[in-house]
Amino acid sequence: FGGTYATQANFKIMREAMDKVGEELGRYIRVCNYCSGLCMPEIAIMGAFEGLDVMLNDALYGILFRDINMQRTLIDQYMSRIINGFAGVIINTGEDNYLTTADAVEAAHTVLASDLINEQLALLAGLPEEQMGLGHAFEMDPMLDNGFLYELAQAQMAREIFPKAPLKYMPPTKFMTGNIFRGHLQDALFNMIGIWTN
């Protein structure tokens, strides 16, 4: 398993470690963890106490991929987003996960639909647009004709629709084949789009 458990002790350890390294490097390092699943408000409180900067916070992901009770998780998300908004924590949403399980061209509209839903749910909870890390991912087949232009168009569309949001743009994973040269090119194209549409 990757990552760390979402406990207050782990949040404290990570914050202290990143502050130490940040002091050595002369810059601030953000700490990110997840605030999802069955304990969203509780995790949001712990993250706020320990000074986390970013939290993955998306009930729709749990409904679609984990079969979590819809009503309960949407209420949990509402409470956790109130807490994250008050604490100044940026939330990340999970739209990139849709594209790892579906064709990124055929399902492109689902990402925008989910972003729009997540934006409205965040606004209802009082979360400012500047704290909405709405999700997207660079997951189209790299062999697709004009695929780079489609990726650029999708990213630019998200930037124009959500101009104040610190969008979460995820790098390519599904079509990383082990061809190192091609993988570096895919990462470079992803970075280029991220910079162009910032």
Segments predicted by a language model, with ranges:
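Anaerobic metallocofactor- and corrinoid-dependent redox/one-carbon enzyme cores
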Residues: 1-198
